[in-house]
């Protein structure tokens, strides 16, 4: 550590800071970590993993499946390496968020908590309970996963536009320098650090899926994407069902925070400076604004993000049919394009945006199922699960969210003709199950003959 860095830490506001990683598993352009580094003489960096996520979740569906768990483990391993390169250490502790932090704060006599702003209702509820337990402890929650902070929005959060189009028209004119914040040095760990009563999680060596978790992999992909031709053809290819280069594929790293949306926008602006703006580069920023909108949408509406009636106040005319749900999950419906998409999801943890729209539309309209079960299954399976984008988009498709039309049904036959005219995708994922009935029993559980 050089003299300048020592001076910064000696003049710090707090003797011991605690930084809690959540959906911000990176060091570079981590504004919350940067604030913790500037204001803490010594620092503990931790991540709380609740193993019940692999067993329990909404509607009896485990919240985290194998693909996202593998990606998370890879991301944590890379984060640990990045921190060690800066003289720090990542402590991964197993247990509930509330119990771990309560004991850690008390036992280590932590002076301040630093973490990134989270849009999830339950994550905010957990943090609120912790703040009530320690009312005199400073909690510093930094906007870290959006393009704009709440103060930079041209409206109060309570006045967030009801539709994306209205939101986009208000925020697109905002002038913003999307520079990134390097974090080159971190305060040291406190001396004689130990964690009695905690179980430290071992990060195992795991085989890589199609996506490799971690900050280094994210930055490598970011550089590669804007160095090639894909960014110039994004608008034309983004709806492809099964081509890795057809869309940006930033979403898994964005979801875990291995990559910041500011880093993507900075790279996009650099690309436009070198090659010029075009329709495709605009559509990349357009899709990032969708993500931005759903972040603030979730923050504004809180628990209503998970409500059956959503924002509409009117419950959809759907229900829950166990057999239909299981067939949809396994890709065993009368709809080949849906089957192929679901089998792709189950095998890889990923599905194209177009595929997600088709299977969600089928779930709600053809199968007449409660949209929340579909959202919960996506939460389990998707490697790029993001609470606001996932549940917000499902509300949108179910007609109870931010869609001004209130009804978003896709004609599956026409969509197949348009996006898989030669049935290549369906054949690749064995989606054609001709003659497969929707039900084998009726509403009273009598066999259908």
Curated annotation (Swiss-Prot):
InterPro entries: Cry_DASH, Crypto/Photolyase_FAD-like_sf, Crypto/Photolyase_N_sf, Cryptochr/Photolyase_FAD-bd, Cryptochrome/DNA_photolyase_1, DNA_photolyase_N, Rossmann-like_a/b/a_fold. Residues 15-147 form the Photolyase/cryptochrome alpha/beta domain. The keyword DNA-binding applies. Binds 1 FAD per subunit. Binds 1 5,10-methenyltetrahydrofolate (MTHF) per subunit. Keywords: Chromophore, DNA-binding, FAD, Flavoprotein, Repressor, Transcription, Transcription regulation. It comes from the Bacteria. Its cofactor is FAD; (6R)-5,10-methylene-5,6,7,8-tetrahydrofolate. NCBIfam families: crypto_DASH. This is Cryptochrome DASH.
């Amino acid at each position: 550590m050089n003299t300048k860095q020592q001076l910064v830490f000696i003049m710090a506001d707090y003797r011991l800071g605690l930084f809690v990683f959540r959906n911000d598993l990176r060091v570079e352009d981590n504004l919350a970590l940067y604030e913790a580094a500037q204001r803490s003489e010594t620092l503990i960096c931790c991540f709380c993993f609740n193993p019940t996520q692999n067993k329990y979740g909404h509607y009896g569906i485990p919240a985290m499946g194998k693909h996202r768990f593998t990606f998370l483990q890879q991301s944590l391993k890379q984060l640990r390496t990045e921190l060690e390169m800066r003289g720090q250490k990542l402590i991964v502790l197993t247990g509930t968020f509330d119990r771990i932090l309560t004991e850690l704060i008390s036992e280590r006599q932590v002076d301040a908590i630093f973490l990134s702003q989270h849009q999830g209702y339950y994550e905010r509820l957990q943090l609120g309970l912790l703040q009530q337990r320690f009312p005199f402890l400073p909690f510093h929650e930094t906007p870290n996963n959006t393009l704009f902070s709440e103060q930079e929005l041209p409206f109060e959060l309570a006045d967030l536009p009801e539709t994306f189009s209205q939101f986009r028209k208000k925020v697109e004119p905002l002038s913003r320098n999307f520079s990134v914040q390097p974090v080159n040095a971190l305060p040291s760990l406190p001396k004689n650090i130990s964690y009695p009563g905690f179980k430290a999680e071992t990060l195992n060596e795991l085989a890589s899926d199609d996506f490799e978790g971690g900050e280094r992999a994210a930055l490598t992909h970011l550089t590669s994407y804007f160095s090639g031709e894909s960014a110039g053809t994004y608008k034309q290819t983004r709806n492809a069902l099964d081509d890795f280069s057809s869309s940006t594929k930033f979403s898994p790293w964005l979801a875990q925070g291995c990559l910041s949306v500011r880093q993507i926008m900075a790279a996009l602006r650099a690309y436009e400076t070198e090659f010029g703006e075009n329709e495709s580069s605009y559509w990349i920023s357009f899709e990032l604004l969708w993500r931005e909108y759903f972040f603030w949408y979730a923050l504004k509406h809180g628990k209503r993000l998970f409500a059956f009636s959503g924002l509409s106040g009117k419950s959809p005319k759907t229900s829950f049919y166990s057999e239909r749900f299981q067939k949809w999950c396994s890709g065993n419906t009368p709809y080949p394009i849906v089957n192929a998409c679901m089998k792709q999801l189950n095998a890889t943890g990923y599905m194209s945006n177009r595929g997600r729209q088709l299977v969600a539309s089928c779930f709600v309209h053809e199968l007449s199922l409660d949209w929340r079960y579909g959202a919960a299954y996506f939460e389990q399976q998707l490697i790029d699960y993001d609470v606001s984008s996932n549940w917000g988009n499902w509300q949108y498709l179910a007609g109870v969210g931010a869609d001004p039309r209130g009804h978003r049904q896709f004609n599956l036959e026409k969509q197949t003709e348009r996006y898989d005219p030669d049935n290549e995708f369906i054949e690749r994922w064995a989606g054609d199950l001709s003659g497969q009935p929707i039900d084998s029993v009726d509403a009273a559980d009598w066999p259908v003959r």
